[in-house]
């Protein structure tokens, strides 16, 4: 029995970076483990939304109270970053980013993905994969370009020569560094957190990993908040037309 427990602990603490389980779709290879965990997170969010909105009451119950609190938090976050006049249409986008990243990060800390065996690689939080974080960052880039072009038309590109045309290369470079910083910050923090916990579980499996897991949950929440806040700030900058 003790041997079985030790085997399970070492399985949970095994560290594999760069190992992937692929699905072949036509001539393309996709990272199956990222899709599996992403679908799980999306399904969980949809399930919670359906349960919370199935029977709305004038005097809300505990679940409805919690959902309303989350929505108010997202609304206030979006309004603070984008502004009173424009924020309403961007609540769904910023809210979806925040909730997906938050639940993805927490799933990596709370769910023992490594127990589920794959032919190759291992399951982990969706945000533990650089492809996911880059995709989220690119979506944010598309969103703030769309926001600026939709409001200002082609005159939006005039921001690149403000306050002087000399800054044109730097202003263009800034639009490339924004998604890079968003994606690598999120990916690096989540990967580092899971690696630290995995190493500590393998060294001291019973005591030290517990406070580290709580710290990881806190850090995961902060990273989701930072990503959503910066996404809202970038959209707000595009709508205002200045940096």
UniProtKB/Swiss-Prot annotation:
| InterPro entries found in the cross-reference section | ATP_syn_F0_a_bact/chloroplast (IPR045082), ATP_synth_F0_asu (IPR000568), ATP_synth_F0_asu_AS (IPR023011), F0_ATP_A_sf (IPR035908)
* Topology of the protein relative to the lipid bilayer: Multi-pass membrane protein
Q: Which PROSITE patterns match?
A: ATPASE_A
The main place the protein resides is: plastid
N-terminal signal peptide: none
Answer yes or no on keyword Transmembrane helix. Answer: yes
Q: Kindly list the GO molecular function terms attached to this UniProt entry.
A: proton-transporting ATP synthase activity, rotational mechanism
Annotated compartments: Plastid, Chloroplast thylakoid membrane
This protein's UniProt keywords: ATP synthesis, CF(0), Chloroplast, Hydrogen ion transport, Ion transport, Membrane, Plastid, Thylakoid, Transmembrane, Transmembrane helix, Transport
| A GO cellular component entry from the record | chloroplast thylakoid membrane
Spans through the membrane: 32-52, 91-111, 130-150, 195-215, 216-236
Q: HAMAP family of this UniProt entry?
A: ATP_synth_a_bact
Q: Which family does it belong to?
A: Belongs to the ATPase A chain family.
Against NCBIfam families, the record matches this protein to: ATP_synt_6_or_A (TIGR01131)
This molecule's function is given as:
Key component of the proton channel; it plays a direct role in the translocation of protons across the membrane.
Q: How does it assemble?
A: F-type ATPases have 2 components, CF(1) - the catalytic core - and CF(0) - the membrane proton channel. CF(1) has five subunits: alpha(3), beta(3), gamma(1), delta(1), epsilon(1). CF(0) has four main subunits: a, b, b' and c.
| Name of the protein in question | ATP synthase subunit a, chloroplastic
Q: Which organism is it from?
A: Chaetosphaeridium globosum (Charophycean green alga)
In the UniProt record, what gene is named as encoding this protein?
atpI
